[in-house]
Swiss-Prot record:
GO molecular function: ATP binding; ATP hydrolysis activity
Coiled-coil spans in chain: 12-94
Cellular component GO terms held in the UniProt record: proteasome complex
Organism encoding this protein: Stackebrandtia nassauensis (strain DSM 44728 / CIP 108903 / NRRL B-16338 / NBRC 102104 / LLR-40K-21)
Free-text comment on this protein's domains from its UniProt entry: Consists of three main regions, an N-terminal coiled-coil domain that binds to protein Pup and functions as a docking station, an interdomain involved in ARC hexamerization, and a C-terminal ATPase domain of the AAA type.
Entry keyword Coiled coil: yes
Name the record gives this protein: Proteasome-associated ATPase
Region of interest (Docks into pockets in the proteasome alpha-ring), residue spans: 595-596
UniProt KW keywords: ATP-binding, Chaperone, Coiled coil, Nucleotide-binding, Proteasome
Binding locations of ATP: 280-285
Classification lineage: Bacteria, Bacillati, Actinomycetota, Actinomycetes, Glycomycetales
Role: ATPase which is responsible for recognizing, binding, unfolding and translocation of pupylated proteins into the bacterial 20S proteasome core particle. May be essential for opening the gate of the 20S proteasome via an interaction with its C-terminus, thereby allowing substrate entry and access to the site of proteolysis. Thus, the C-termini of the proteasomal ATPase may function like a 'key in a lock' to induce gate opening and therefore regulate proteolysis.
Domain of life: Bacteria
Recorded metabolic or biological pathway in which this protein acts: Protein degradation; proteasomal Pup-dependent pathway
Length: 596
């Protein structure tokens, strides 16, 4: 019984073990199936993970770019905030004032002029006191301390220097100046003017509030009226005036070049020369040539090298006569004094000085001839005293030019003032040839046909052109008749174009001919100056002058044109095509009042 029980027990245990093994086998089979299924699904899962990884990387890159943009935006915003803060701080700062530096003190303070007050203020440590210059502008903070040095003032009033005032050290540090209202004032000289060559009559820039003069205006009051240079004109460029040139060279150059001989013979050099004659005949040209020639001769006498880059030095003060006149009483006289003061300064340097008054009759008229202002009553005596004052000086001569010498005050023309009087006549035929030769030269392009007529000789061609042009101008033919004048006694006289020729007219004729040659070349490609151009230019020049005599009082016109003698009362033009026009007579006007 017990044996059977044991067997049953073993059988039951085997069944249980068998069931357990079966269960384990099923579990292992399921696990194996699951493993097989997972092994089959693994590649797809890996691909899914790779896709997720790639998407994650792309998202990370996008976030990085976005972060970089945000960082840049934050930086820009920070910079803008800083800039705005600086702008706000700058706008919130109190205003800075300007002052004028006067003097530095030993204790480190400085004296400045600001707001109409003279103050002693502190100096910023960043500024060296030695770097500040008197009259210099400085910047002041809200505590009125100097924080920055600036330049010199460049705007203000223009005044005239009258006299320099020296300090205790012997150097000028102040100046006596006058304004246009003749108000005198003493001003300080800024350091910018300490070493500047200042002289009476100079124009200075003054800041009226601080009382400092900062700058010398280059165009001073006298320089507005004179041309201080050596003209580039020589005697060779003047034609037809050999006799007059010889006279003025004797009057001007000999005293300068041979002063010892003049002293030995006790001969006083002439003080002045008057050049008079009709307009356009070379008065101003001769005066310029005198200055140029005198500069060269003086340089040669002193052994200077005139051929180098430096020009020979002399001074030609070309006074613009009408501009001397000023509406303020005494201003014209003061200008004359300044002109001669400038001449004395230049002469003291040992250089020849020529004071040239062009259109002298416009300023120095006969005293008592004026009707309304009578300014000549004071201007003429001022010039007389200045010319007499030149007597004690060397190297100064006065040259006057006028086409109405009859209107100049006789006291100016007497010996001892304008000693030498040279009349510049209208050119005759021989003089006209000489003048033409200055403008019609072999260097000009000449027409081939005209050259062929002279055998290809340029010299012969030019001479033929000049000869034909002079004959056209000076022949007393019907076509050259210009005017018929009637004198007060009833006599009549026919005047030809040759009676009114001048060097300026000849130059104008040549210029017309050259312009005709240029226009012909542009239109027909025929190059070169032709004789016909000169002849046509003569006709055009004459035609332009047809109406000129009738534009003014005949008697005054005759005086200006150089026709002196009995008074002319009637003028009639005789130019072809003008026969229907009547002349112009003189009407006697009575009770003219004070204005005529």
């Amino acid at each position: 019984m017990s044996r059977n029980d044991d067997e049953q027990a073993r059988g039951s245990r085997w069944e249980r073990e068998t069931q357990d093994l079966s269960t384990q086998v099923e579990y292992l089979q399921e696990e194996l199936a699951l493993a097989r299924r997972k092994l089959t699904e693994t590649p797809g899962h890996v691909r899914l993970l790779e896709e997720r990884l790639a998407a994650t990387k792309a998202q990370v890159e996008r976030m990085s770019e976005q972060n970089e943009r945000l960082v840049a935006t934050l930086k820009d915003a920070r910079e803008q905030i800083v800039t705005l803060k600086e702008e706000i701080d700058r706008l919130a700062q109190p205003p800075s004032g300007y002052g004028v530096f006067i003097e530095a003190r030993e204790d480190g303070t400085v004296d400045v002029f600001t707001g109409g007050r003279k103050m002693r203020v502190a100096l910023s440590p960043s500024i060296e006191p030695e770097s500040l210059r008197r009259g210099q502008e400085v910047l002041l903070n809200d505590a009125l301390n100097v924080v920055e040095s600036l330049g010199f003032e460049r705007a203000g009033d223009v005044v005239t220097l009258k006299e320099l005032i020296e300090s205790d050290t012997g150097h000028p540090d102040r100046a006596l100046v006058t304004s246009h209202a003749d108000e005198e004032r003493v001003v300080h000289l800024a350091d910018s003017l300490t070493n500047a060559p200042l002289r009476a009559g100079d124009s200075l820039l003054v800041e009226p509030r601080s009382g400092y003069a900062y700058e010398r205006i280059q165009k001073s009051e006298v320089e507005e009226l004179v041309l201080e240079e050596v003209p580039d004109v020589d005697y060779e460029s003047i034609g037809g005036l050999d006799g007059q040139i010889e006279l003025i060279r004797d009057a001007v150059e000999l005293p300068f070049l041979h002063a010892d001989l003049f002293a030995e013979y006790e001969l006083r050099p002439p003080k002045g020369v008057l050049l008079y004659g009709p307009p356009g005949c070379g008065k101003t040209l001769i005066a310029k040539a005198v200055a140029n020639s005198l500069a060269k001769k003086v340089a040669e006498a002193r052994g200077d090298d005139f051929t180098g880059g430096d020009r020979a030095k002399s001074y030609f003060l070309n006074i613009k006569g009408p501009e001397l006149l000023n509406k303020y009483v005494g201003e014209t006289e003061r200008h004359i004094r300044l002109v001669f003061q400038r001449a004395r300064e230049k002469a003291s340097e040992g250089q020849p000085v020529i004071v040239f008054f062009d259109e002298m009759d416009s300023v120095f008229r006969t005293r008592g001839s004026g009707v309304s202002s009578d300014v000549e009553n004071t201007i003429v005596p001022q010039l007389l005293s200045e010319i007499d004052g030149v007597e004690g000086l060397e190297n100064v001569i006065v040259i006057g030019a006028s086409n109405r010498e009859d209107m100049i005050d006789p006291a100016i023309l007497r010996p001892g003032r304008l000693d030498v009087k040279i009349k510049i006549e209208r050119p005759d035929a021989e003089s006209a040839r000489d003048i033409f030769s200055k403008y019609v030269t072999t260097k000009l392009p000449l027409n081939e046909a005209d050259l062929a007529e002279q055998g290809g000789s340029r010299e012969a061609c030019v001479q033929e052109m000049i000869q034909q042009a002079v004959e056209r101008m000076y022949t007393e033919t019907e076509e050259n008749r210009f005017l018929e004048v009637t004198y007060a006694d009833g006599d009549k006289e026919v005047l030809y174009f040759k009676d009114f020729n001048s060097g300026a007219m000849i130059q104008n004729i040549v210029d017309r001919a050259k312009k005709m040659a240029i226009k012909e070349f542009l239109n027909s490609q025929r190059k070169g100056l032709r004789l016909q151009h000169l002849l046509d230019a003569c006709v055009d020049e004459f035609r332009e002058n047809e109406d000129l005599p009738n534009t003014t009082n005949p008697d005054d016109w005759a005086r200006i044109s150089g026709k002196k003698g009995e008074r002319i009362v009637y003028i009639r033009t005789l130019v072809s095509g003008k026969g229907d026009e009547s002349g112009r007579s003189i009407d006697t006007v009575s009770n003219t009042g004070q204005y005529l």
